[in-house]
Amino acid sequence: VSSSAAVPASIGIPLTKRNASESFWVITGTTKSHKISGDIALAAQSTATVVILMGMSKLSEIVQIFSNEGKSETAIAIIQNGTRANEKVGVGTISNIESIVEEKQLSNPAIIIIGEVVNQRVDLSNIYERADLAQQNTRKRSA
């Protein structure tokens, strides 16, 4: 499973969701020639979820591109070291994500997710504990 789908899912962000996003783009943030991918500007014009890999060094440019498209209040999440014990997550909007990155000291390796689906995030903290509790409640009702 690609990290572009698995890492957002691991913190409860779906890449598509009815009434939020019908599709998604997966884009490399930095090309072989160390420039920002031109596809980011195209993706910023769409309503799709945008997943950017290797984009932290271009975050300021990404923010500018989305802001230029009138999307400064669009939700964005950055997941550093996704699915690992040292995972860090920053969630905000295009307009404030750079200050969140600074505050949380986010850096590479990280995945950037942009779009309404970030607001659909399901809190998966303690999911196993909650599942166990639900199973216990079911057993009590059955008894």
List each model region and its residues:
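Short glycine-cluster motifs
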Residues: V1-T30
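A contiguous loop/helix-start segment that scaffolds small-molecule binding in enzyme catalytic cores
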Residues: S21-S23, K32-A143
